[in-house]
Amino acid sequence: MNRNEILFDRAKAIIPGGVNSPVRAFGSVGGVPRFIKKAEGAYVWDENGTRYTDYVGSWGPAIVGHAHPEVVEAVREAALGGLSFGAPTEGEIAIAEQIAEIMPSVERLRLVSSGTEATMTAIRLARGFTGRDKIIKFEGCYHGHSDSLLVKAGSGLLTFGNPSSAGVPADFTKHTLVLEYNNIAQLEEAFAQSGDEIACVIVEPFVGNMNLVRPTEAFVKALRGLTEKHGAVLIYDEVMTGFRVALGGAQSLHGITPDLTTMGKVIGGGMPLAAFGGRKDIMECISPLGGVYQAGTLSGNPIAVAAGLKTLEIIQREGFYENLTALTQRLANGIAAAKAHGIEFAADSVGGMFGLYFAAHVPRNYADMARSNIDAFKRFFHGMLDRGIAFGPSAYEAGFVSAAHTPELIDETVAVAVEVFKAMAA
């Protein structure tokens, strides 16, 4: 029995399912999860000492590569000054100023510790600001695990085929309207029927939790136009896409100014840090200025802020996103070209984020993604993993490239994909 098997058995005896986040359990692909011992650059090593080229990237945060020496040094220096204070720090101001400078839609910003906190509070804030209850989300979009959002959500919920979570009272979700992504007609109908009751629309501006799904230009324009017309708050959930698809996030690519933005992952540089921000008049409804409550013992943790500040510095260096985008396109295009005869396969990418689909076409919504060949993905996933390439253990997860990947490493990955596709077609 190898170390991964030993540790998984040990974990299952004390941790429900053996993991602290469901998708890590390999439930949708089968087999034993790899317990990671260390990570550096574009690689991770499991407890057996096996090295993998990593395209999970801690599910997005590791944009500069794992254990980047400058980030590690920033964390070390911050830790020497104390781990947590429960009081304001200059670093909090600095990172808020940095984010606001990069994202003009962010006039005011509040730090929290997780993407779930950010989206949960942004929705509470939208409801408090508008005095309305209803919210719109889209099937397959994942916005964390707060109760009102666990309705036809993405990520692990799609992996396990659950349209919602047990333990969530129906009353908690009765104000949540779930529409099809990229379906303008449904969006227009929802506002025609309930426009004066809708507090907000929350959307992943590029979906990453039913694999990578792009919005159409018309859909994006409809989101902004209808929310403005009806006085609803448009929330861009950029926890995944922020600083990942472009320096200014998806909103900079769309040319859209959302009312509120949630962010996380990259801004913490691998540490637990997230944020929500946006229009001054909305943000000033949050306590202590307004009546919408939010608090957190570890919000703005100085160690996480130090990691985030250094990461933001690195990603603003000349050529960073041009290089990252080129690497990601090289990977997606290379794997798509490597597919074997008789295997339906497509790929897409934006910035440092990519999608691999065992389907004839790139999906436009959850229904499209649900028709993909999940069994083929399982075979591909394990074929790549057995050859030292780690993708996310779910057909519904987007993948990530970092600045630590090189063209040579991408080409090695594509060569392995050629082998795996041939084995699948045999």
Swiss-Prot record:
One annotated Gene Ontology cellular component of this protein: cytoplasm
Keywords noted in UniProt: Cytoplasm, Isomerase, Porphyrin biosynthesis, Pyridoxal phosphate
Stored InterPro entries: 4pyrrol_synth_GluAld_NH2Trfase (IPR004639), Aminotrans_3 (IPR005814), Aminotrans_3_PPA_site (IPR049704), PyrdxlP-dep_Trfase (IPR015424), PyrdxlP-dep_Trfase_major (IPR015421), PyrdxlP-dep_Trfase_small (IPR015422)
Reaction(s) catalysed by this chain's protein: (S)-4-amino-5-oxopentanoate = 5-aminolevulinate
Pfam families, per database record: Aminotran_3 (PF00202)
Pathway participation: Porphyrin-containing compound metabolism; protoporphyrin-IX biosynthesis; 5-aminolevulinate from L-glutamyl-tRNA(Glu): step 2/2
GO molecular function terms attached to this record: glutamate-1-semialdehyde 2,1-aminomutase activity; pyridoxal phosphate binding; transaminase activity
Major enzyme class: isomerase
GO biological process, alphabetically ordered: protoporphyrinogen IX biosynthetic process
Protein name (database record): Glutamate-1-semialdehyde 2,1-aminomutase
Lineage: Bacteria, Pseudomonadati, Pseudomonadota, Betaproteobacteria, Neisseriales
Gene that produces this protein: hemL
